[in-house]
């Protein structure tokens, strides 16, 4: 049953759903299909996490800027790719930190509110985007992907055709 229907989308309910995940065994391609033929809980959870990655898209005079909050992530956790020539894909995975206090056996979480797991955003780039001039910078937990624009095509000058006398 969907917990969001009852307003129970809380860290506790998310943790309970995670605990109730049953291994899929041989349930379909890439873990997308469970034993019952429907999507697995893990697949649905990942799809939800991917859809919950907010981004700002800016149209600047010479470039497009895609701004995504990435708190606590290292550059090695983030992947920026261009697929099928015009599809910008920003993806990665957030993991729990492995600090010394978490390695102790006596450590237990009293509250788990930070979102962990996979994230992904896809953007179709405009025709005037220069896919060969893309840069990505992650500073203070904010990823900025800049895609430069191609220069506008020069207007075609009319071609004059000489009329000959026959």
Swiss-Prot record:
Question: Residue ranges of the sHSP domain?
Answer: 46-166
Which GO terms are recorded in the biological process aspect for this UniProt protein? Answer: protein complex oligomerization; protein folding; response to heat; response to hydrogen peroxide; response to salt stress
This chain belongs to the protein called: 18.0 kDa class II heat shock protein
The family database entries (PROSITE patterns) matched by this protein are listed as: SHSP
Q: Which gene encodes it?
A: HSP18.0
Q: How does it assemble?
A: May form oligomeric structures.
Q: Name one GO cellular component term.
A: cytoplasm
Which protein family is it in? Belongs to the small heat shock protein (HSP20) family.
The alphabetical list of record keywords is: Cytoplasm, Stress response
Q: Which domain of life is it from?
A: Eukaryota
Instruction: Give the induction text.
Output: By heat shock.
Where does this protein come from, organism-wise? Answer: Oryza sativa subsp. japonica (Rice)
InterPro entries attached here?
A-crystallin/Hsp20_dom, HSP20-like_chaperone, Small_HSP
SUPFAM superfamilies (UniProt xref): HSP20-like chaperones
Name the Gene Ontology molecular function terms of this record: unfolded protein binding
Q: What is its main location?
A: cytoplasm
Where does the record say this protein resides? Cytoplasm
Disulfide links within the chain? none
Q: Which PANTHER family match?
A: HEAT-SHOCK PROTEIN 20 FAMILY MEMBER (PTHR11527)
């Amino acid at each position: 049953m969907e917990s969001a229907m009852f307003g129970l989308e809380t860290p506790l309910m998310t943790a309970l759903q995670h605990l109730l995940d049953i291994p899929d065994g041989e349930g379909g391609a890439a873990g997308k299909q469970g034993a019952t033929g429907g999507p697995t809980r893990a697949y649905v959870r990942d799809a939800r996490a991917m859809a919950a990655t907010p981004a700002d898209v800016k149209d600047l005079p010479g470039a497009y800027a895609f701004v995504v909050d990435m708190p606590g992530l290292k550059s090695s956790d983030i992947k920026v790719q261009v697929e099928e020539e015009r599809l910008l894909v920003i993806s990665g995975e957030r993991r729990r930190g492995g600090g010394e206090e978490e390695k102790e056996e006596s450590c237990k979480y009293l509250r788990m509110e930070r979102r962990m797991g996979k994230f992904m955003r896809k953007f179709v780039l405009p025709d005037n985007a220069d896919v060969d001039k893309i840069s990505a910078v992650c500073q203070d937990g904010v990823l900025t992907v800049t895609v430069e624009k191609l220069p506008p095509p020069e207007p075609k000058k009319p071609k004059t055709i000489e009329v000959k006398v026959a």
